[in-house]
Amino acid sequence: FRDDGVIQVRAGSTGPKFPYTPNEGHMHNFTWRLDVDLNGAGGDSAYLTSHSEDFMPPLSTATDGRERIVIEKGLLWNPRNFNTLLIEDSTLKNGSNPPRATSYELVPLRTGTARHSEPFTKRDFWVSRYDPAQSFLADNLPNYVQNRQSTVNQDLVIWYTGSEHHENNSRDE
Protein backbone atom coordinates (compact mmCIF):
# COMPACT_ATOMS: atom_id res chain seq x y z
CA PHE A 1 0.00 0.00 0.00
CA ARG A 2 1.17 3.49 -0.78
CA ASP A 3 0.46 6.50 1.47
CA ASP A 4 -2.44 7.56 -0.75
CA GLY A 5 -4.13 4.14 -0.47
CA VAL A 6 -3.01 2.86 -3.86
CA ILE A 7 -2.14 -0.83 -3.97
CA GLN A 8 0.77 -1.24 -6.35
CA VAL A 9 1.63 -4.79 -7.37
CA ARG A 10 4.68 -6.06 -9.17
CA ALA A 11 5.33 -9.40 -10.75
CA GLY A 12 8.44 -10.86 -12.23
CA SER A 13 9.49 -14.12 -13.71
CA THR A 14 12.74 -15.89 -14.26
CA GLY A 15 13.92 -19.26 -15.44
CA PRO A 16 15.73 -21.03 -18.22
CA LYS A 17 14.75 -20.72 -21.85
CA PHE A 18 12.88 -23.57 -23.47
CA PRO A 19 15.62 -25.93 -24.66
CA TYR A 20 14.07 -26.63 -28.06
CA THR A 21 12.60 -23.20 -28.81
CA PRO A 22 14.98 -20.71 -27.15
CA ASN A 23 13.69 -17.65 -29.02
CA GLU A 24 9.97 -18.28 -28.75
CA GLY A 25 7.89 -15.52 -27.19
CA HIS A 26 5.15 -16.49 -24.77
CA MET A 27 2.65 -15.13 -22.25
CA HIS A 28 2.82 -15.03 -18.46
CA ASN A 29 -0.46 -14.92 -16.54
CA PHE A 30 -0.51 -13.43 -13.04
CA THR A 31 -3.53 -13.71 -10.77
CA TRP A 32 -3.91 -11.60 -7.65
CA ARG A 33 -6.34 -12.47 -4.85
CA LEU A 34 -7.70 -9.38 -3.07
CA ASP A 35 -9.70 -10.05 0.09
CA VAL A 36 -11.37 -6.65 0.30
CA ASP A 37 -12.66 -5.83 3.78
CA LEU A 38 -13.69 -2.19 3.80
CA ASN A 39 -14.99 -1.40 7.30
CA GLY A 40 -14.55 -5.06 8.30
CA ALA A 41 -15.85 -8.24 6.74
CA GLY A 42 -19.21 -7.96 4.99
CA GLY A 43 -21.13 -4.99 3.67
CA ASP A 44 -19.16 -4.79 0.41
CA SER A 45 -20.53 -4.77 -3.13
CA ALA A 46 -18.78 -4.75 -6.51
CA TYR A 47 -19.59 -2.71 -9.62
CA LEU A 48 -18.26 -2.92 -13.15
CA THR A 49 -17.78 0.66 -14.30
CA SER A 50 -17.40 1.91 -17.85
CA HIS A 51 -16.59 5.13 -19.65
CA SER A 52 -17.25 5.54 -23.36
CA GLU A 53 -16.69 8.55 -25.57
CA ASP A 54 -18.20 9.48 -28.90
CA PHE A 55 -16.14 11.94 -30.92
CA MET A 56 -18.53 12.35 -33.82
CA PRO A 57 -18.73 16.00 -34.92
CA PRO A 58 -20.31 18.38 -34.24
CA LEU A 59 -20.79 17.19 -30.64
CA SER A 60 -18.57 15.02 -28.48
CA THR A 61 -20.25 13.10 -25.70
CA ALA A 62 -19.14 10.84 -22.87
CA THR A 63 -21.16 8.25 -21.00
CA ASP A 64 -20.31 6.69 -17.64
CA GLY A 65 -21.89 3.43 -16.57
CA ARG A 66 -22.02 1.42 -13.37
CA GLU A 67 -23.37 -2.15 -13.23
CA ARG A 68 -23.78 -3.80 -9.85
CA ILE A 69 -22.44 -7.36 -9.75
CA VAL A 70 -25.20 -9.23 -7.92
CA ILE A 71 -23.92 -12.84 -8.12
CA GLU A 72 -20.53 -14.52 -8.16
CA LYS A 73 -19.06 -14.61 -11.64
CA GLY A 74 -16.19 -13.88 -13.98
CA LEU A 75 -16.07 -10.60 -15.90
CA LEU A 76 -14.34 -9.48 -19.07
CA TRP A 77 -12.39 -6.25 -19.29
CA ASN A 78 -13.25 -4.21 -22.36
CA PRO A 79 -10.54 -1.63 -23.16
CA ARG A 80 -12.94 0.36 -25.37
CA ASN A 81 -15.15 0.93 -22.32
CA PHE A 82 -12.28 1.69 -19.93
CA ASN A 83 -13.73 -0.86 -17.50
CA THR A 84 -12.71 -0.79 -13.86
CA LEU A 85 -13.99 -2.76 -10.91
CA LEU A 86 -15.29 -0.70 -8.00
CA ILE A 87 -15.59 -2.32 -4.56
CA GLU A 88 -17.75 -0.25 -2.24
CA ASP A 89 -18.85 -0.51 1.42
CA SER A 90 -22.55 0.15 2.00
CA THR A 91 -22.17 1.78 5.42
CA LEU A 92 -18.75 3.48 5.58
CA LYS A 93 -18.88 7.05 4.25
CA ASN A 94 -15.94 9.34 3.54
CA GLY A 95 -15.59 12.99 4.51
CA SER A 96 -16.55 14.58 1.20
CA ASN A 97 -19.58 16.84 0.91
CA PRO A 98 -21.96 15.18 0.41
CA PRO A 99 -20.48 12.02 1.99
CA ARG A 100 -19.82 9.19 -0.45
CA ALA A 101 -19.41 5.47 0.13
CA THR A 102 -15.82 4.41 0.77
CA SER A 103 -14.52 2.32 -2.09
CA TYR A 104 -11.54 0.90 -3.94
CA GLU A 105 -11.27 1.03 -7.72
CA LEU A 106 -9.34 -1.73 -9.45
CA VAL A 107 -7.83 -0.41 -12.68
CA PRO A 108 -6.54 -3.25 -14.88
CA LEU A 109 -3.10 -3.38 -16.41
CA ARG A 110 -3.14 -1.97 -19.93
CA THR A 111 -1.04 -4.78 -21.34
CA GLY A 112 -3.69 -6.80 -23.09
CA THR A 113 -5.21 -10.09 -22.19
CA ALA A 114 -4.29 -13.67 -22.91
CA ARG A 115 -6.80 -16.45 -23.42
CA HIS A 116 -5.19 -19.81 -22.84
CA SER A 117 -6.59 -23.27 -22.26
CA GLU A 118 -6.70 -22.81 -18.48
CA PRO A 119 -10.25 -21.87 -17.44
CA PHE A 120 -9.13 -19.03 -15.15
CA THR A 121 -7.67 -17.11 -18.13
CA LYS A 122 -11.07 -16.80 -19.83
CA ARG A 123 -12.04 -13.82 -17.64
CA ASP A 124 -10.11 -10.81 -16.31
CA PHE A 125 -11.97 -10.25 -13.02
CA TRP A 126 -13.65 -12.79 -10.79
CA VAL A 127 -15.95 -11.75 -7.94
CA SER A 128 -16.61 -14.35 -5.25
CA ARG A 129 -17.80 -14.44 -1.67
CA TYR A 130 -15.14 -15.10 0.93
CA ASP A 131 -14.59 -18.78 1.64
CA PRO A 132 -11.57 -19.80 3.75
CA ALA A 133 -11.17 -22.95 1.63
CA GLN A 134 -10.64 -20.81 -1.50
CA SER A 135 -7.23 -19.31 -0.83
CA PHE A 136 -5.32 -20.49 -3.87
CA LEU A 137 -5.85 -20.59 -7.61
CA ALA A 138 -5.08 -24.30 -7.84
CA ASP A 139 -8.77 -25.27 -7.82
CA ASN A 140 -9.53 -22.89 -10.71
CA LEU A 141 -11.63 -19.79 -10.38
CA PRO A 142 -14.65 -21.05 -12.33
CA ASN A 143 -15.22 -23.58 -9.54
CA TYR A 144 -15.25 -20.79 -6.95
CA VAL A 145 -18.15 -18.96 -8.60
CA GLN A 146 -20.23 -21.89 -9.86
CA ASN A 147 -22.76 -21.60 -7.00
CA ARG A 148 -23.54 -18.04 -8.14
CA GLN A 149 -24.15 -16.78 -4.61
CA SER A 150 -25.22 -13.21 -3.95
CA THR A 151 -22.40 -10.66 -3.84
CA VAL A 152 -24.47 -7.72 -2.58
CA ASN A 153 -23.29 -6.42 0.82
CA GLN A 154 -21.08 -9.48 1.38
CA ASP A 155 -17.51 -10.29 2.35
CA LEU A 156 -15.97 -10.27 -1.15
CA VAL A 157 -12.81 -11.63 -2.70
CA ILE A 158 -11.72 -10.15 -6.02
CA TRP A 159 -9.46 -12.16 -8.30
CA TYR A 160 -7.67 -10.29 -11.06
CA THR A 161 -5.68 -11.91 -13.87
CA GLY A 162 -3.25 -9.82 -15.88
CA SER A 163 -0.99 -11.00 -18.67
CA GLU A 164 2.41 -10.02 -19.98
CA HIS A 165 3.98 -10.99 -23.28
CA HIS A 166 7.58 -12.12 -22.84
CA GLU A 167 10.04 -11.88 -25.70
CA ASN A 168 13.21 -13.77 -24.86
CA ASN A 169 16.46 -11.81 -24.80
CA SER A 170 20.06 -12.33 -23.73
CA ARG A 171 19.27 -11.74 -20.02
CA ASP A 172 17.07 -14.86 -20.02
CA GLU A 173 20.01 -17.27 -19.82
Task: Describe the function of each predicted region.
Residues 9:
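Active-site-proximal segments of catalytic enzyme domains
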Residues 2-6, 16-173:
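Extended effector regions of multi-domain proteins
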